């Protein structure tokens, strides 16, 4: 396990100690509805049908505000429940868009309790687990573990807290992804100026989806860190979380993609 630097540790404690700030339903719901109207407008590539990419953009109103990442509060959750049970609305979504809505709704449960998700280092290097060497394997940190039976499930708060606790960097909100989107993220994101090899990507996808194959629960989040203990530089990257069917076992693969200064 990494030894946390005092700067990053204090930053993390401040993050968790600060009062939770949430996107107000008075602004997020109208913003969502406006995006949906645009997605069903004459200039939309899907016409009256809402595409997954359009829905994802619309639903960001519930987790982002001008101040940064925000959480889904109880009023927003009630609205999302109404829309989940709105048959005409659900029928206007493509199949993958409907899956995104359901996954987003499940993850962002307006329960701001972080359940005890342990993340321990795995046996073997990323290269051995992916079956290939290259920039992806060289810059991947892999951990996995359980929430004890009866002590909760992997929701938004749990994933975020576990990542920062065991990997160190503060992290943005997790969002659902498909296997196709996982392949795109792993294969097209530059890692310190290099492109991952096909073998690395295929190996990583196989390894990650061992956990999510039956559950179809895959999530991605971006992270940045100011002078984390593992680098004298400011760093950034992303993390993939694969969650089991019972939402208790989680495998996380964090990828360090770039340095961007040491101020």
Predicted features and spans:
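Structured segments of extracytoplasmic/periplasmic soluble domains
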Residues: 61-69, 83-90, 104-107, 211
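Short, charged early-sequence alpha-helical segments and their helix-coil boundaries
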Residues: 71-83, 90-103
């Amino acid at each position: 396990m990494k030894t946390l630097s005092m700067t990053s540790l204090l930053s993390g404690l401040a993050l968790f100690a600060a009062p939770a700030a949430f996107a107000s339903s008075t602004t997020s719901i109208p913003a969502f509805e406006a995006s949906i109207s645009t997605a069903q407008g004459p200039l939309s590539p899907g016409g009256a049908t809402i595409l997954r990419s359009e829905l994802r953009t619309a639903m960001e109103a519930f987790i982002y505000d001008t101040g940064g990442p925000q959480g889904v509060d109880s009023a927003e959750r009630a609205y999302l429940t109404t829309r989940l049970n709105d048959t005409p609305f659900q029928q206007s979504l493509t199949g993958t868009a409907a899956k995104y809505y359901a996954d987003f709704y499940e993850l962002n449960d307006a329960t701001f309790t972080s359940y005890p998700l342990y993340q321990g280092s795995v046996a073997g290097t990323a290269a051995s687990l992916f079956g290939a060497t290259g920039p992806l394997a060289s810059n991947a940190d892999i951990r996995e573990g359980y929430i004890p039976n009866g002590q909760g499930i992997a929701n938004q708060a749990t994933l975020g807290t576990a990542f920062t606790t065991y990997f160190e960097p503060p992290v943005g909100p997790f969002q659902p992804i498909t296997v196709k989107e996982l392949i795109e993220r792993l294969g097209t994101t530059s890692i310190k100026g290099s492109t991952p090899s096909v073998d690395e990507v295929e190996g990583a996808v196989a390894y990650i989806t061992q956990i999510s194959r039956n559950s179809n629960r895959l999530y991605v989040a971006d992270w940045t860190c100011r002078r984390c203990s593992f680098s004298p530089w400011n760093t950034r990257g992303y993390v993939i979380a694969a969650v089991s069917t019972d939402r208790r076992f989680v495998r996380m693969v964090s990828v360090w993609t770039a340095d961007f200064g040491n101020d």
